[in-house]
C-alpha cells in the first residue's frame, strides 16, 4: 500500500477497540461524530486492503475484538433515528439551519456502516462473529429489500437532481431518499454473504430467512423487477458505483454484479441441505420459484455454470407435490435490537429531536469550520481516488470526467458548462469544504 496507507500500524486496532453503541439521543454529538469519522477511516482502509489483496486486517480486528455486533446495533439504531427522529426535524417549519452537513453526517452514517459490513462480510468468520445479531441483520436486510421491491413498483428510485425552489432541509430529504436506494443494494450483498454461511447458521436464523420472511420468493421478485436496471431513451442503464451508467450493446448480456448476488443467494437458500430441510414448498412458493426458469438462459448458465444445478432443481420441482404450511411448535430466538431500542425510546421522539435541535444541529460558525477541517482530514483525496472502482464521473451529466472543482477539489466535471449548471446545487457544500481546507 505504501503511501496509500490511511491508518498507521496499531492505529486501526485502537479505532476498532474504541467502537461502541450510542443512545439515539447522542447521535450527532461530539463523541458520536468522532466515531463516525473513525468508521469512515476503517471503511476506506478495509476497501484499500481488499483492493491490494494484502490480507484483511480490519476484518480480523473486528472479529478479534468482538465488534461486529456493535456495528449491527449502530446500523439499526441509525435506521431507527432516520425513521423516527429525522422526520420530526423536517416538520419543524422554523428550523432553517444555515448548513445541514451535521445532520447529513447522521443520515449518511447508515450508508457508512452497511458499506463496511459489505466489505468485511465476504469472509465467513465475520458472519459467525456477529453471533445472535445476525438475526437482527437478516431482519434489517429484509426491510431494505422489501422497500426496494415496493419502490421499483412505483417508478424506481428518486432522481438526484433537486428543485431550484427547495430549501436545505428539503434537499437533504431528497438526498436521504436516494441514499436509501444505495443502502438497499448494499444490504442485498450483505444478505448474499450471510447465505454463504447457510451451513453454519443457527436454526433460528434459517427459520427467520425461510419461514418468517420467505426470502427465496422475495429474491425472485427482485429478479423480476431488477430495480438496478432501467431504460432511458431506449438505452439500457444499470446502477453501479453510486451512479447510473449506460450499458454498451455488446455488454448487455453480461451478468451484472447485483443480479449475480441474487442468483448466488437463491442457489444457497434452495440447494443447500440445511436450507432444504427447513424450507416449506407451499403452492405459493412453488409458483413463485418456477418463474425462475424463464431467466435461466444459456447465456446466464455460461456465466454461472453452477446454476445448472438450480435448473435441475426447478425441473424436479414441477413434479413435486406442494406442502401445507408447517405449524410446528418450535422455540426460537428472535431479533431483539429494534424492539429494545423502540421500547427504550417510545414516546421520546419529539424530546430527542428537540434536544438535538438545540444542542447538536445548531452549531456556531466556528464549530462548523472545525468540523469541516476534520472532514477534510478524514476524506483524503488520494485515498478516495484509490478506492474508487473506476475513473471519476461528471457530477452533472455522469460522463467520464477529467476536471475537478478548483475551490473544494471534491467534485469532478467533464467540461466547464456542466460545472456552471451544477453550481447552484454544489455551491452550498463547496464553500464549507473549501473553508475546511483553509483551516488546516
From Swiss-Prot:
GO terms for biological process: cilium movement; inner dynein arm assembly; motile cilium assembly; outer dynein arm assembly; positive regulation of motile cilium assembly; protein localization to cilium. One of its GO terms (cellular component) is dynein axonemal particle. Residues 366-440 are annotated as: Interaction with DNAAF11. It is found in: Cytoplasm; Cytoplasm, Cytoskeleton, Microtubule organizing center, Centrosome, Centriolar satellite; Apical cell membrane; Dynein axonemal particle. Pfam families: zf-MYND. One of its GO terms (molecular function) is protein folding chaperone. Belongs to the ZMYND10 family. Plays a role in axonemal structure organization and motility. Involved in axonemal pre-assembly of inner and outer dynein arms (IDA and ODA, respectively) for proper axoneme building for cilia motility. May act by indirectly regulating transcription of dynein proteins. Interacts (via C-terminus) with DNAAF11 (via CS domain); this interaction stabilizes DNAAF11 at the protein level. Interacts (via C-terminus) with DNAL1; this interaction stabilizes DNAL1 at the protein level. Interacts with DNAAF4, HSPA8, IQUB, RUVBL2 and DYNTL5. This is Zinc finger MYND domain-containing protein 10. It comes from Homo sapiens.
Amino acid at each position: 500500500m505504501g503511501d496509500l496507507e490511511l491508518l498507521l500500524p496499531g492505529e486501526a486496532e485502537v479505532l476498532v477497540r474504541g467502537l461502541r453503541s450510542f443512545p439515539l439521543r447522542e447521535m450527532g454529538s461530539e463523541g458520536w461524530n468522532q466515531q463516525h469519522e473513525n468508521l469512515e477511516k476503517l471503511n476506506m482502509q478495509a476497501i484499500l486492503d481488499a483492493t491490494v489483496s494484502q490480507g484483511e486486517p480490519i476484518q480480523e480486528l473486528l472479529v478479534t475484538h468482538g465488534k461486529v455486533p456493535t456495528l449491527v446495533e449502530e446500523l439499526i439504531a441509525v435506521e431507527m433515528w432516520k425513521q423516527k427522529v429525522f422526520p420530526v426535524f423536517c416538520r419543524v417549519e422554523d428550523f432553517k439551519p444555515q448548513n445541514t452537513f451535521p445532520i447529513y453526517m447522521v443520515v449518511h452514517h447508515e450508508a457508512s456502516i452497511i458499506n463496511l459490513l459489505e466489505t468485511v462480510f465476504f469472509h465467513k468468520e465475520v458472519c459467525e462473529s456477529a453471533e445472535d445479531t445476525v438475526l437482527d441483520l437478516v431482519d434489517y436486510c429484509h426491510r431494505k429489500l422489501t422497500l426496494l421491491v415496493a419502490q421499483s413498483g412505483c417508478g424506481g428510485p428518486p432522481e438526484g437532481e433537486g428543485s431550484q425552489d427547495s430549501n436545505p432541509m428539503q434537499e437533504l430529504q431528497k438526498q436521504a431518499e436516494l441514499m436509501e436506494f444505495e443502502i438497499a443494494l448494499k444490504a442485498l450483498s450483505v444478505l448474499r454473504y450471510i447465505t454463504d454461511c447457510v451451513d453454519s447458521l443457527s436454526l433460528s436464523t434459517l427459520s427467520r430467512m425461510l419461514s418468517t420472511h420467505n426470502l427465496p420468493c422475495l429474491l425472485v421478485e427482485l429478479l423480476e423487477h431488477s430495480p438496478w436496471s432501467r431504460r432511458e431513451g431506449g438505452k439500457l442503464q444499470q446502477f453501479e458505483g453510486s451512479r447510473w451508467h449506460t450499458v454498451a450493446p455488446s455488454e448487455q448480456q453480461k451478468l451484472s454484479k447485483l443480479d449475480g448476488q441474487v442468483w448466488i443467494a437463491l442457489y444457497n437458500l434452495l440447494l443447500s441441505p440445511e436450507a432444504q430441510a427447513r424450507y416449506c414448498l407451499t403452492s405459493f412458493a412453488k409458483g413463485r420459484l418456477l418463474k425462475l426458469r424463464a431467466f435461466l438462459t444459456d447465456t446466464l448458465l455460461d456465466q454461472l455454470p453452477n446454476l445448472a444445478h438450480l435448473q435441475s432443481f426447478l425441473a424436479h420441482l414441477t413434479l413435486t407435490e406442494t406442502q401445507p404450511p408447517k405449524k410446528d411448535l418450535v422455540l426460537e430466538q428472535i431479533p431483539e435490537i429494534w424492539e429494545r431500542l423502540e421500547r427504550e425510546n417510545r414516546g421520546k421522539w419529539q424530546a430527542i429531536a428537540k434536544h438535538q435541535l438545540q444542542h447538536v444541529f445548531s452549531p456556531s460558525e466556528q464549530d462548523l469550520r472545525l468540523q469541516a477541517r476534520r472532514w477534510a482530514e478524514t476524506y483524503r483525496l488520494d485515498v478516495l481516488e484509490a478506492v474508487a472502482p473506476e475513473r471519476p464521473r461528471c457530477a452533472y451529466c455522469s460522463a467520464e470526467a477529467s476536471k475537478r472543482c478548483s475551490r473544494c477539489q471534491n467534485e469532478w466535471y467533464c467540461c466547464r458548462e456542466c460545472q456552471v449548471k451544477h453550481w447552484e446545487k454544489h455551491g452550498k457544500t463547496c464553500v464549507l469544504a473549501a473553508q475546511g481546507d483553509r483551516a488546516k
